[in-house]
Amino acid sequence: MNTVRYVAMCLVLMLQCLVLSAQVFSVHEIPDSIWTRMLGRSYPLGCELQRSDLRYLELSYVDFEGQEHVGQMVCNRQIADDLLYIFRRLYEARYPIASMRLIDDFDADDSRSMAANNTSCFCYRRVAGSTALSKHSRGMAVDVNPLYNPCVYVRSGRVLPPEGKAYAHDRERRKDIPGKIDTADLCYRLFVSRGFRWGGAWRSL
């Protein structure tokens, strides 16, 4: 019996080591293959940032079915290490993320990316309904599970993406919203701990 238990314990430890070794949390200068995908999409003509200002991240994550993936993200180099830290902690906690693809897979269409519940960072674009550049244009903002955590314009009631309307209202008391980010949520706490501000607290929109 002791031998059986010992063998079983060894197998468990081996499996844990395999899982740990499969984790990917890396930061790179923008590879040529990624740069080619970005040009004319998330990095259009006239973008004020330099290629050297940006970093390409590969990040392990767990989806809402518990399946593991390696996602892709482009961000400003100033926050690359912060994002590695945050998403490693989210992965370790098995915090679910629906999708993490470059917004270039959606032709840099923010609405399509959000409707697909895609977590992303850099995209050189204007704030919706404004001439001002978005913080995403500098690679300094991250949308996490944006379908479940839509942007709600306080003044007009407009919801982006529109597909997220079902998750937009009565959020404080509702328990049926998957991946809901609020001030008690791990995702919120990790981002705030690294100096980020939460869009859910904005009142100027």
Locate predicted features.
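Bacterial N-terminal signal peptides that target proteins for export
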Residues: 1-8
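Catalytic cores and adjacent binding grooves of peptidoglycan-active enzymes
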Residues: 127-129, 139-205
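Intrinsically disordered, low-complexity boundary segments flanking structured domains
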Residues: 40-48, 108-110, 128-133
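Active-site acidic/histidine clusters and adjacent loop/turn architecture
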Residues: 49-114
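N-terminal module-boundary/linker segments of secreted carbohydrate-active enzymes
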Residues: 23-67
